Amino acid sequence: MKINNNQNIDFKTIKVNPIAGALGAQIDNIDLSENLPDEIISEIYDALLAYQVIFFRDQKFSPDTQKAFAERIGKPIVYPFVKSLENFPEITPILKKETDTNNFGGIWHSDTTYQEEPPMGTMLYGIETPDYGGDTEWSNQYMAYESLSEGMKKFLDTLEAVNISGKSRVAKTRSDIMKHASVGLKGDELKAIHPVVRLSLIHI
């Protein structure tokens, strides 16, 4: 069973260290806040497609440099329901207080599938994280699909799904983050129809 179609790339400018059998890799000794050569950016993108989730440790972003790096990977979007950083509509702060009880986005989901054109991935920058717990987890949907019977694949290939922003368990996990003074609900309920089987979203 293959993970995806790109797992045998010969990287020339970066060192990619796979961290799990199903997906994920870490790229070390690189400063993403710098104006990196196009060749490095291209290989970072290839690694993202190959491993679906990639990690970079010890990064120091300002909002400007975070946005600049994201723009070299793809086109940043504005998250429709939570207020963004001032002057940086594409960057959404996720703030947690000790009294917060909800886990923001804390069930299995693909980000913003209720949009007509969901983004190709999500970029997370951890500024202050707990010593343990608070994990973000991913699953390899290529592998999940490939493990199905041919009959089930053919059945799923014919289906479309209605994705609605306000009628899911994910929507309920937004409540705590909307309580903060710096964030809040905005916009109307969104809905989009997508094929059940499609290209997976990917994360940095």
Can you name each region flagged by the protein language model?
Residues K2-I202:
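Non-heme Fe(II) oxygenase catalytic core, chiefly the N-lobe of the double-stranded beta-helix
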